Swiss-Prot record:
Top-level division of the source organism's lineage: Archaea
Top enzyme category: transferase
Taxonomic source organism: Methanopyrus kandleri (strain AV19 / DSM 6324 / JCM 9639 / NBRC 100938)
Catalytic activity, as annotated: dTMP + ATP = dTDP + ADP
Family of this protein: Belongs to the thymidylate kinase family.
Residue positions binding ATP: 9-16
GO terms of biological process kind: dTDP biosynthetic process; dTTP biosynthetic process; dUDP biosynthetic process
Protein name: Probable thymidylate kinase
Keyword Kinase: yes
MF-aspect GO terms: ATP binding; dTMP kinase activity
Amino acid sequence: MGLYLGVEGIDGVGKSSVVNLAAEFLEIHGLEVTTVREPSTDIGREALEWDDPYLQALAFTLDRMLTLKRVDFEAADVVLSDRTFLSTLAYQSALGADMRWLLELQRPVPKPDVVYIIDREPLAEDATFDKEFLERVRNRYREAARLIEEEFDVEIKWIEAEDMDKEEIAELIVADARRRLDDPLGIPDDLLEG
């Protein structure tokens, strides 16, 4: 099985563009890449219009499980996802759902090896949501990331992206993915020499 990587962040940070660029860069390096976008099913897309964060969380979790069930993790060197279960924790808790309940709901969901969180100030012109709500979601990402690292075997990597363009962010992800694929055990270079 290859790497399962997720790209996260508030609306408007450029997740979709970064995922597309990173996939393109990885393919240039000869890697087999499968991209995933959440939500991807009718129920997941429909849930975007609902007002109840608990119902949304249930729908997004179903969407996620159905989407990931279709992914052949064995055939890809890298599975790159535009959003992961972390989105449900951040967004639905910002809308009022209990974070612990959301965490338990995600327990059976396949987990990425690494989640890259693109972090920058919300820009009102970029997003579907107002700036105040996105700032609340941004704070919930921090809380959710701490819980996830405690509860699951998922590494969280923050990308401070205030002064970075999408290509630079994608290049960081690609470099990290290639390093992990070349050295899956994470053995420091100095231990491998001599």
